[in-house]
């Protein structure tokens, strides 16, 4: 690969908490819902990076939303009331003019996020915080590699949609089955490889790593975004560096979840 100075730039944002309400709920696939949030609190919201994440505060069952206080020592919650569950989510699409924000939720299990999303109705309120920062990746790499499972699909889909027409991208996306494939529109030259688990366990099947190992990848300078189960992301990164001669600083490998751990999200 040709050595070039294309280091991604990290920027920080003022951390704010926002009270939003559900504007619409619509299925993207049988196992993924797109929930549009809106409200005047989105004034000043910024999310320039496809890998950004917001913190969503899910109230306990039967409880109203709770807005913590953000101070120098972090978040402080009111005493005597159940704390909300907090999870990280990708801002899928932000419309500053309409003051709306799309967030995609994977429906799996009975965790707080899936449970809330499955019952979400127009007018319900929810609290979000962030993003605290963004990683800005230049648009002039020779090509882009994106790989991940359903948890990474909002970030991958957003990146593909935001790439310019001059860009080239190859994506490997692991989903439960063919019904979980999504329509992703992009101006760039995009090649998407959908990998179906078809009953295999997520995060423990080798689908993504095996597919990337077997792929004939282009020459040139590449930026790689890998996200999903933590051990998978690390294994793909190791393969790209040791066997494909990718520059480590041109790889973002994020662990969005960890097998056997209910709430595991590496900072990014």
Q: Which residues does each PLM region occupy?
A:
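Extended, composition-driven regions rather than compact fold-specific motifs
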Residues: 1-268
């Amino acid at each position: 690969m040709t050595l070039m100075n294309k280091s991604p730039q990290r920027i920080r944002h003022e951390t704010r908490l926002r009270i939003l309400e559900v504007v619409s709920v619509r299925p993207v696939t049988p196992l993924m819902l797109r929930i549009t949030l809106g409200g005047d609190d989105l004034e000043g919201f910024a999310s320039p990076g496809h890998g950004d994440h917001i913190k969503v505060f899910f109230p306990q069952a039967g409880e109203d939303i709770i807005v913590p206080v953000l101070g120098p020592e972090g978040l402080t919650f009111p005493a005597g009331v159940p704390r909300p569950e907090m999870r990280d989510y990708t801002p899928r699409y932000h419309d500053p003019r309409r003051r709306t924000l799309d967030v995609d939720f994977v429906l799996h299990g009975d965790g707080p996020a899936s449970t809330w999303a499955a019952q979400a109705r127009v007018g319900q309120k929810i609290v979000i915080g962030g993003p605290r920062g963004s990683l800005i990746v230049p648009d002039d790499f020779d090509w882009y590699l994106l790989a991940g499972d359903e948890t990474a699909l909002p970030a991958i889909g957003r990146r593909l949609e935001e790439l310019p027409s001059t860009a080239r991208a190859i994506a490997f996306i692991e989903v439960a089955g063919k019904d979980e494939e999504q329509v992703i529109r992009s101006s760039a030259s995009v090649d998407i490889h959908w990998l179906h688990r078809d009953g295999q366990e997520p995060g423990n099947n080798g689908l993504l790593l095996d597919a990337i190992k077997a792929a004939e990848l282009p020459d040139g300078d590449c930026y790689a975004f890998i996200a999903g189960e933590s051990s998978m992301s690390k294994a793909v990164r190791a393969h790209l560096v040791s066997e494909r001669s990718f520059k480590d600083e041109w790889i973002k490998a994020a662990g969005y979840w960890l097998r056997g751990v209910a709430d595991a999200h590496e900072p990014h």
